[in-house]
Amino acid sequence: MAHEPIPFSFLRNLLAELDASEHEVLRFLCRDVAPASKTAEDALRALQRRRLLTLSSMAELLCALRRFDVLKVRFGMTRECAGRLLGHGFLSQYRLQVAAINNMVGSEDLRVMCLCAGKLLPPSCTPRCLVDLVSALEDAGAISPQDVSVLVTLLHAVCRYDLSVALSAVAHGHMTVGVGTPVQDEPMDVLEVDDAEPMEATPACDEIGVVKLAGAASAGAPLADGAFAACTSAGKGEDLATSDLTDSEPEDSVFAVADPVYADVDLSMFVRANATADSSMFVNADAGADSSLVNADAGADSSLVNADAGADSSLVNAVADANSSLMRTTSACTDSEPEDSAGPSCAGMALSMFGRAKSVSSLLLRTKASY
């Protein structure tokens, strides 16, 4: 029953279920038996006249098209059952291979292959798939089942070496293509990375104030600007210095200062004033026209005096107290110190002159006693 001819009326309904590309593949598969056929219907008619259109050959054609659904609906045959009928038809391994790689070549690759073929193709030839291109090259005599060198070259032009190798092996009889089994792409070489050797760790500097000392001679070597840093060894003998930065330091400061550093201040801007027995007065006179404001907080028994010294001096702050004694002080102030730092205490300073002060630290001048 597998070798009995199939009525053509039955095949017309079968062809209606195939699309245009499958018609082209079906016609290409029958070219060895019906080379002059122009359509799939003509190819099947030629097979029927030669009594080659049997159930086994039809199962082989549908398996090559991978239409197992049609095979089951029209013939009631499963894929496993159809596999037992294969290998007894008229299909060559070369045509089965080309049909298998037909869907693996995209439209862009097909366009490049047509351009590379050049004058081998007729001017009016516009292939829509790979089997159309192969059929046109066969008509031109450039390709045959025994000579596929031109097709291999075209596949190399689009870097499809996997398809060209499989096609060459089939053409030379070194490989057999199973019907309905497309050629799988060869796996690409994977670069293996040896993870046994750990990567070299890089010392991380996550905290602010950790700097790399490129030219440090030793761990205890003094740094520039009188700053001191603690040097530790990390990584490959690299020296790291950690500095204790505070919020009171300016942002451009890198190294912390161990002790307060007092810059040389021109003391000519301060005037030593002598107070009488009845009152004591501190006078800070600035020689420039633009001087700063000095605010003194006075209690109930003290008087606040803000006097303008004129064009050459800015403000005079005097705190008077009838019971205060004479006191002379010389101060040196640095503007670089923070306001919340009182600095060294002034020796021998009597605070009774300030009366009931709300905050002593707010009234003290930022001074350093000179001895």
Curated annotation (Swiss-Prot):
Alphabetized UniProt keyword annotations: Host-virus interaction, Inhibition of host NF-kappa-B by virus
SUPFAM superfamilies referenced in this protein's UniProt entry, alphabetically: DEATH domain (SSF47986)
InterPro entries referenced in this protein's UniProt entry, alphabetically: DEATH-like_dom_sf, DED_dom
Domain DED: 6-76, 93-169
GO BP annotations listed: regulation of apoptotic process; symbiont-mediated suppression of host apoptosis; symbiont-mediated suppression of host NF-kappaB cascade
Complex and partners: Interacts (via C-terminus) with host HSP90AA1. Interacts (via N-terminus) with host CASP8. Interacts with host FADD.
The protein's role, per its UniProt record: Plays a role in inhibition of host innate immune response. Reduces TNF-alpha-mediated NF-kappa-B activation. Interferes with IKK kinase activity and reduces the phosphorylation of both components CHUK/IKKA and IKBKB/IKKB.
Name under which the protein is recorded: Protein MC160
Species whose genome carries this gene: Molluscum contagiosum virus subtype 1
